[in-house]
Design a protein with these regions (language model features):
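Non-catalytic, conserved peripheral segments adjacent to functional cores
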Residues: 3-132, 151-153, 160-225
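Short beta-strand His + acidic residue motifs that chelate non-heme Fe in jelly-roll/DSBH
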Residues: 137, 145-150, 158
Length: 225
């Protein structure tokens, strides 16, 4: 049985015309980034001295104070090398809210709004996540998600509010010109599909996508929530 997509409808998301930045306990939250309802960039407070640093990577109370009340059920971690692009992914009948961050290296992380009832349907937003800036990106249910590795290697962690359902995978082309994602450092001409051949980073690193991710179609042929 499919799960109905939940809407993050608290006061944190009522004003979608401008980015609102608020400090909540040990986090600073930028809400509705890119003018897209529900997308948030979260920056934790880092307490450092000559020994190193300490930070809270997740605090349920701070999140609730920011108007974000999500029950996460699974944590995932991946390692990828430079030029790897993973995405754009979603689950159709079991949509996932994701809270993502890079714990090593540097990635460009992207979310595309696939909510049919959204005034920003088809709009994308991207943010650089790195071990240095320690930013986290909150992506509600109803979005396609992906990232590009810009460092030699990157370790990527994400919390999700529903489990992985392998028979429910969905995706869309990372390079669909109708969406027009501006992937940093990527050079190449659109071949009419999601195939990575002919694409590379500015330093000559070939773009690296899975076979599955090179078969996804564009926005017009993609599932809507």
């Amino acid at each position: 049985m499919s799960k109905k997509r939940k809407t993050l409808s608290l006061t944190a998301y009522q004003n979608t015309d401008a980015i609102e930045e608020r400090k909540m306990g040990q986090i600073t939250v930028e809400k509705n980034v890119g003018g897209i309802e529900g997308l948030c960039v979260i920056t934790p407070a880092v307490h450092g001295d000559a020994r190193g640093y300490f930070m809270e990577t997740y605090n349920e109370n701070d999140m609730k104070e920011a108007g974000i009340d999500i029950k996460f059920v699974q944590d995932n971690q991946s390692m990828s090398t430079k030029g790897v692009l993973r995405g754009l992914h979603f689950q159709k009948q079991y949509p996932q809210c994701k809270l993502v961050r890079a714990v090593r290296g540097n990635v460009f992380d992207v979310a595309v709004d696939l909510r049919a009832d959204s005034k920003t349907y088809g709009k994308w937003y991207g943010v650089e996540l790195s071990a240095e800036n320690k930013k986290q990106f909150l992506i509600p249910e109803g979005f396609a998600h992906g990232f590009l590795v810009l460092s030699e290697e990157a370790e990527f962690c994400y919390k999700v509010n529903d489990f992985y359902h392998p028979n429910d995978e969905g995706g869309m082309a990372w390079n669909d010109p109708e969406i027009g994602i501006e992937w940093p450092q990527v050079k190449g001409e659109y071949p009419g599909n999601a195939v990575a051949d002919g694409y590379e980073l500015e330093d000559g690193t070939k773009l690296n996508l899975s076979e599955k991710d090179q078969k996804w179609l564009g926005l017009k042929e993609t599932f809507r929530f």
